[in-house]
A protein has these predicted regions:
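Basic polycationic patches enriched in arginine
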Residues: 4-7, 20
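Short, Lys/Arg-enriched N-terminal segments with co-localized hydrophobic residues
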Residues: 11-13, 17-29
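C-terminal accessory module of base-excision DNA glycosylases/AP lyases that mediates lesion recognition
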Residues: 23-72, 175-260
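Alpha-helical ds-nucleic-acid-binding substructure associated with the helix-hairpin-helix region
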Residues: 42, 61, 65, 93-94, ...
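Short acidic alpha-helix initiation/capping motifs at coil-to-helix transition points
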Residues: 42-43, 78-81, 115-117, 156-159, ...
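Alpha-helical scaffolds flanking conserved acidic
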Residues: 49, 79-83, 119, 163-164
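Alpha-helical scaffold segments that form or flank carboxylate-/histidine-based iron centers
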Residues: 77-92
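Short, amphipathic alpha-helical segments that act as regulatory/interfacial helices
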Residues: 85, 102, 139-142, 233-236, ...
Length: 260
């Protein structure tokens, strides 16, 4: 995975999960020392509408993106082991391949419960299309959940940084994967995946920057979008997909295609 960028099964750009994380997030201990809080707002259809209105009022560039490319829609992702395992399946493969593997895995483990996944043999998991590394990541994640190191019940009590710290204990779950999971599976409203290439490219064009911003600069730009950075990320992804030539939008730009 080193030095590579790829799209995952959501059509988002998954970065190298080991890419200078300390520089981007202010050090490896930041999330571990974050206080516990309970997020009060969930990004749903109603709050997304409110978020987009507030973002457009506060940032003319966001208003322009919404006018030119249309409004984004929310994306769905399973919660729990299934959601994180789906992210692992989607790492470093095409959208089509990830979907095929995931459907076979769902058929083999209908409950998508950690204990049932652990009961599968390597041969069975290999037969559905999982690589050796992804089997290892899946087993590690399932074990962490079964043994209580990752608790989805307590996840709701943690602020974003602490939740990311908990999830990234598992092998194969880096900050980007954890952030995407919290955004789409739990509706966390104020997350900006600073390592996402799609967001970087969109922000460069939206803000008319001469060069692509690094993660640190993107996060600095995104400070102006609090407390709706997740909604701003949806705007940027949608803007990039519907303005491929950064000229006239596609004829279907006003209708967001549901992520797969």
């Amino acid at each position: 995975m080193q030095g590579r960028q790829s799209r995952n099964h959501f059509g988002l750009h998954m970065p190298n999960l080991q890419f200078r994380l300390a520089a981007c997030y202010g050090g490896s201990n930041m999330a571990k020392t974050a206080p516990k809080t309970t997020p009060q707002i969930v990004l749903d259809k109603k709050t997304l509408k409110k978020a987009l209105a507030e973002l457009a009022a506060a940032d003319p560039d966001i208003a322009r993106a919404l006018d030119e490319a249309g409004h984004p829609e929310l994306r769905d992702m399973p919660t729990g082991f299934g959601g994180l395992m789906r992210s692992i399946v989607g790492q470093q493969v095409s959208v089509h391949a990830a979907r095929s593997i995931w459907l076979r895995l769902e058929a083999a483990v209908p409950s998508m419960e950690p204990a049932d996944f652990l009961a599968m043999s390597d041969e069975q998991l290999r037969a559905v299309g999982l690589s050796g590394a992804k089997m290892k990541y899946g087993r590690s994640l399932a074990t962490d959940i079964v043994e209580g190191r990752i608790s989805f019940d307590s996840l709701h009590e943690l602020d974003d940084a602490a939740a990311i710290a908990m999830l990234t204990q598992a092998k194969g779950i880096g900050p980007w994967t954890a952030e995407i999971y919290l955004m789409f599976a739990h509706g966390r409203p104020d997350i900006m995946p600073g390592l996402d290439l799609g967001l970087v490219v969109a922000a460069q064009h939206l803000k008319k920057l001469r060069t692509r911003p690094d993660a640190k600069r993107l996060l600095k730009i995104a400070e102006a979008w609090r407390p709706w950075r997740s909604a701003a990320a949806l705007v940027l992804w949608h803007y990039r997909r519907n303005m491929p030539d950064w000229g006239a939008p596609r004829s279907s730009a006003k209708t967001e295609k549901k992520a797969t």
